[in-house]
Design a protein with these regions (language model features):
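Single conserved hydrophobic/aromatic residue that forms the stacking wall/gate
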Residues: 1-13
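Hydrophobic, Leu/Ile/Phe/Ala-enriched alpha-helical segments that form helix-helix packing faces
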Residues: 7, 27, 31, 104-111
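Intrinsically disordered, low-complexity regulatory segments enriched in Ser/Thr/Pro
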Residues: 64-95
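Mixed-charge, Lys/Arg-enriched low-complexity segments
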Residues: 15, 87-135
């Protein structure tokens, strides 16, 4: 029956939208704003990825520019993928909601070497205060 199939598609779309909205809300609520801003976020979009409801985030981070996909799997964990062109890298397949910001940040912005990232940030801060004088 055609109306039943259309209703199923609509319900699936609604579910994907709700999951994507929940992921976004959790990310924004639990990740410091300065960290979110460092990712250079351009857009959020609800999507299906590997037949899982997901949030696609367009980012311009220090270590990754492209898309981050956060998908909710059947075990109620998030799977995090980095996508650049046709290349896909699975960052982690078992991420709890409260770890999401840290997992994404390590993958796209700060990396695993805290001292190196702190040095980079300090250099960037100093660059903001340098005045260039031209003759």
């Amino acid at each position: 029956d055609r109306s039943s199939a259309a209703s199923d598609v609509y319900k699936r779309q609604e579910y994907v939208m709700q999951v994507a909205q929940t992921i976004k809300e959790q990310l924004v609520a639990l990740t410091p704003m300065t960290v979110l801003m460092s990712w250079g976020i351009k857009e959020f979009a609800a999507t299906l990825y590997r037949d899982l409801p997901a949030l696609r985030i367009k980012v311009n981070g220090r270590l990754h520019a492209g898309y981050v996909i956060v998908a909710l799997n059947g075990s109620d964990y998030y799977e995090v993928y980095l996508v650049k062109g046709m290349e896909v890298e699975c960052v982690n397949e078992e991420v709890c909601f409260d770890e999401l910001g840290d997992v994404i940040d390590r993958a796209i912005e700060s990396g695993t070497d805290k001292a190196e990232y702190d040095k980079f940030c300090e250099q960037e801060r100093q660059n903001l205060y340098v005045t260039v004088v031209t003759v």
